[in-house]
Amino acid sequence: QAIRAVTSLPALTGAWRHVGGGILQFPVWEHPYKFDVICRPDLIPEGTQVVNNLQLGRVLTGEQKLNVPIKSMMCWNTNPVTQATESEKILEGLKREDLFLVSAEHFISDTAAFADILLPASMGAEQEDMILSWGHLYLTYNSKCVESPGECLPNNEIFRQLAKRLGYEEENFKWSDSECLENY
């Protein structure tokens, strides 16, 4: 809500009419990153349904139909209830009895509160990663500084363990964090 309030100020004050008085804009096309390399669409099997966060509420409520409806979902690095559009529809969809939700989170967020399974995820200083910043155009290396407390795991490790339990044998599911960074 804070972001919405701040980005409304230029409209409320009329500042948008003056050079430099507009809203904060950081469009994805300004990034010098090669998203097709970072996101590795070549690893997504052909025919896989992809749902954007902007469509999530409509998909979860059945307003927007998919070939195969979502019966289970895993959320990590996102809190759709507060970060996506149509929050009320997302809340309605998360309340479905037939939806199995897993959330990897640091805290019990608005979305994680609906999780059937809540996994303790590590924080930035506790994992090696590459970070796309919202404040500049650099791709930044994040080195691991401290060990994660308790049972917290980096997302990559959660997915490695999940892939192993589900029987995935592809090499990319076995990559270490460093290998993931090298191959992306």
Name each model-derived stretch.
Residues 1, 27-30, 182-184:
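Substrate-binding/catalytic subdomain of NAD(P)-dependent oxidoreductase enzymes
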Residues 1-2, 66-67, 151-153:
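Structural motif
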Residues 2-11, 162:
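Basic, amphipathic alpha-helical segments enriched in Lys/Arg and hydrophobic/aromatic residues
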Residues 5, 90, 155-158:
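Stable alpha-helical elements in mature extracytoplasmic
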Residues 7-114, 122-130, 142:
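Extended redox/cofactor-interaction regions of prokaryotic respiratory oxidoreductases
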Residues 125, 137-149:
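Short beta-alpha connecting loops at secondary-structure transitions
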Residues 145-184:
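N-terminal leader/propeptide and maturation segments of large enzyme subunits in energy/redox metabolism
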